Amino acid sequence: MIEFDEIPDLKTITDGEAEALCARLRSGVVDMVSRTGGHLASNLGVVELTVALHRVFDTGRDRLVFDVGHQCYIHKILTGRGGAMGTLRTFGGLSGFPKPKESVHDAFIAGHASNSVSVALGMARARTLLGEDYHVAALIGDGALTGGLAYEGLSNAGLSREPLLVILNDNGMSITKNVGGVAQHLAHQRLKPQYLRFKKGYRKAMSVLPGGRTIYRVTHKVKTAVKETLLPCSLFEDMGFTYLGPVDGHDVRGLTRLLRYAKDIEGPVLLHIRTVKGKGYPPAERNPDAYHGVSKFCVQTGEPLRPSGASYSGAFGAALCQLAEEDRRVCAITAAMRDGTGLKGFEERFPNRFFDVGISEGHAVAMAAGLAKQGCVPVFAVYSSFLQRGYDMLLHDVAILGLHVVFGVDRAGLVGEDGETHHGLFDVAYLSSVPGMTLYAPSSFAEVGTMLRYALTACDGPAALRYPRGGEGDYHGDAGTVPTLVAREGQGITLVTYGATYPALLAAAEQLEGAGCRPEIIKLNRLCPLDLEPVCRSVSKTGRLLVAEEVAAMGSVGERLCAGLAEAGVVPRAVRLCNTGRGFVPQGTVDQLRRLCGLDSQSLYEAAMEVWKHE
């Protein structure tokens, strides 16, 4: 394995040394990710680009903004964090995404898509307003360009005339079509060093000669007319960018030269590079999607060390396929997360009823509204943290009309190693705020099927199921037919929970019984609208309440239960709301984070004992 802390001075190395470094980095990243897990294919695709960027720019002063941030590992290695890469995505270790709190070289946080150009433009404008001197660059992939926010940023940046470099990493061949040999030859000629030097010198000479500015404008118009005759009109040039490319994204020499040229251009520049996702590791090149995010694996075979088991996503996808067999109006939507949300089987069985809209959650919700308005039953499967991006459309396009759109809210709760940007801790709050919303929380695979059937067949307006990442816990039952279940009668304290926290609370209850307390346990299956009557009746009897839930404190079910109890005139002697608190939760394994938040069985037992003993 490469010693990542042995990185040469990138400003002084030769092109040959840079190429050798790229080979070492690529090999080292494969070895490192095989041990830690993480995002592999995207990082292998940007090795040469990242080395070239660090040869040209000073990221301690210049601002490099990553879109999504999956591809930041090489950047971290080159900025003094190589020795800590073994801690990647672990509790207290390096983040798998850019993080300004971690290093001055990380200009901005990343995790969600399509925002990099907007952020970079803001930084460029701040530089101008404050009279400072540094370069600003945004690195965005062709996948992130499927999000409308990217085009909003590009449109505004092109009009701004701010010196700003946007690097488009095109690894999917989805941005430009093959435009023929003449066009490719001209693009190649336009990027030759001789042409770039002549272009720069010609503009400079014309600016000082008498009448030179007029001559330059005329010749520039002639050149543009010829180019537009032979080349297709560039979207980016129409937006106001100086467009360079497409070029080989694995040529570190050429990239270094182009970046040095591009950073001196006055105004916005778009450098279009073509890369191979998974470059240099054959299994990842053959199947880049499978090696996008990986667990620990064997480098020789590419096989995971621990095969993944059954998951909530898989249970959701299987249940949806069954319901789609019964009702031809049912269709499925994903925002570039077909496999992650368990919809691969649905696409194979019902290709005409499956829609992948790209990284466009707002569009997905609005399109679902259109489908529902015309009689279909759309189901949008989406990660909890990404559904946040479609909240306005959920309110405006779905809820006001009371349209029957169903949301499969995957990765609800703590998701683990991806950290703050990916935990699903806010969906209960924002979904419960939507008028007419019905929100379910299954605690087992069986309940996923039962509750999804209810959402599709028994709800008139918007409905949602929230379920966690990974597999089910020790509870495998199906109580999904009732809104609120009194799972165990008792006295002394009422324990309330739902979803993935239910098994931990059952384990805590067993410990309580061993200590002489027989708690009453209430399992909430429907979180919105809440069925308060069983909770009011129970708390009136026990006098004490503990609510455990894997969500943020503000807008939690516990807060709504307390408000409902107060309105009903039920005042418990002691209350404890166990949740993830008011701050952001860091990265770590789900078990580590549950202990951190006090949501593991032992912590819940200790909290319940304190409430029970309260006089």
Q: Can you describe what each PLM-predicted range is?
A:
Residues 39-160, 329-330, 334-335, 343-344:
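Cofactor-binding active-site loop characterized by glycine-rich and histidine/acidic residues
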Residues 87-119, 129-133, 159-290, 304-319, ...:
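Thiamine diphosphate
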Residues 44, 66-68, 140-141, 168-170, ...:
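Glycine-rich, histidine-containing beta strand-loop boundary motifs that form or position
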Residues 296-298, 432-475:
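Helix-enriched interaction subdomains in cytosolic or periplasmic regions
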Residues 1-78, 235-256, 269-275:
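N-terminal amphipathic, basic-rich helices that act as targeting or association modules
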Residues 34, 46-55, 119-124, 148-155, ...:
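Short alpha-helical segments and helix-capping/turn motifs at coil-helix boundaries
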Residues 6-11, 15, 30-38, 102-108, ...:
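Glycine- and acidic
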Residues 136, 140-153, 342, 354, ...:
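Extended, hydrophobic alpha-helical segments in both membrane/secreted and soluble proteins
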